[in-house]
Amino acid sequence: MIIGITGFIGSGKDTIADYLTTFHGYKRISFAGTLKDACAAVFGWDREMLEGTTKSSREWREQVDPWWSERLNIPELTPRWVLQQWGTEVCRNGFHNDIWVASVENQLRKAKDNIVITDCRFANEVNAIKNAGGITMRVERGDRPKWYDSAVAYNRGPNGNSNWALSKIKLDKAKVHASEYSSVGLKYDHYIDNNGTIDELHNQIEKLINL
């Protein structure tokens, strides 16, 4: 089985993946795995910290790297900013829209284990999992961001959507990166409510994988 998970930061994606790998033998891969490998090599950053699976690593990813910021004259240069820019603007937009999808597809065609992917951020990534025979889930926890409705409207596309252009303006004004809003409002196979206890979350996952 292949399971693709999407959700905002702190929604519980990593918690679900840890449960599946620990108790059900799933192997964890990610669309951004090779991107993080590259950034760790080029910028000399700790690879585990780039993963952002702990509170301390997520906080570190938001901190400006003083040496690189001064050297490249980019005041806002944080590890997370680099991942977004390199992953989307440089590689997706500048090289090929399917570069990260193809990288994961290459891993999937060789895989023999059950797979969990925790960083589905774009429609083509969600579709790739479905096309591979996998299932997708959206994890919800806490309040939705103020720009949520704008993201839903924008992701519907321009056809018959009078709010499309205005929605993009609102997202740009809110300084929301495409990797944060592009998964909002898409159709998923399952929706997970993670506003309860950890046991309640695990029970939802058990029911899902035993369908």
Where in the sequence are the language-model features?
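Small-molecule kinase domains that catalyze NTP-dependent phosphoryl transfer to phosphate-bearing small molecules
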Residues: 6-9, 103, 127-131, 139-211
